[in-house]
């Protein structure tokens, strides 16, 4: 399953302006709620609870906030390129500027984990990350996300 099965073109924010991790999660929750029909506060709370367990920043300027929602019908992805890097409490100390939000139905189990692994592999590829950082509009970002890893490198 390609990453574009998880994220639609309208679920890409090419230059999100935020000043903190909390503000980023709020903005992402608002957009995710708008696109999925979920309650914005419920989405934000799920993301916040997951962050309390440990940061979802995976290093190299990338974060993958994620959570499960009982009323969600299918796995949903949202990608944001931040207009400037922010502190996301990353283990490598690097500020984050690429964020891929992943929401899954409560019973998603292995599918949720597989999606997380695919996203992490894609975004930790330095060539792909470089192309995402250089892309200035949603269509350009979507095109990079649509590339198979070997082609994107």
Curated annotation (Swiss-Prot):
Pfam families on file: PTS_EIIA_2
User: Where are the active-site residues found?
Assistant: 66
InterPro entries documented for this protein: PTrfase/Anion_transptr (IPR016152), PTS_EIIA_type-2_dom (IPR002178), PTS_Nitro_regul (IPR006320), PTS_SugarTrans_NitroReg (IPR051541)
Tell me the Gene Ontology biological-process terms attached to this UniProt entry.
Answer: phosphoenolpyruvate-dependent sugar phosphotransferase system
Where mainly found? cytoplasm
Record keywords: Cytoplasm, Kinase, Transferase
A single GO molecular function, which one? protein-N(PI)-phosphohistidine-sugar phosphotransferase activity
Enumerate the subcellular locations listed in this protein's record, separating them with semicolons.
Cytoplasm
Q: Which GO terms describe its cellular component?
A: cytoplasm
Which PANTHER family does UniProt cross-reference here? NITROGEN REGULATORY PROTEIN (PTHR47738:SF1), PTS SYSTEM FRUCTOSE-LIKE EIIA COMPONENT-RELATED (PTHR47738)
Q: Share the domain note from the entry.
A: The EIIA domain is phosphorylated by phospho-NPr on a histidyl residue.
In its UniProt entry, what is this protein called?
Nitrogen regulatory protein
Q: Which organism is it from?
A: Bradyrhizobium diazoefficiens (strain JCM 10833 / BCRC 13528 / IAM 13628 / NBRC 14792 / USDA 110)
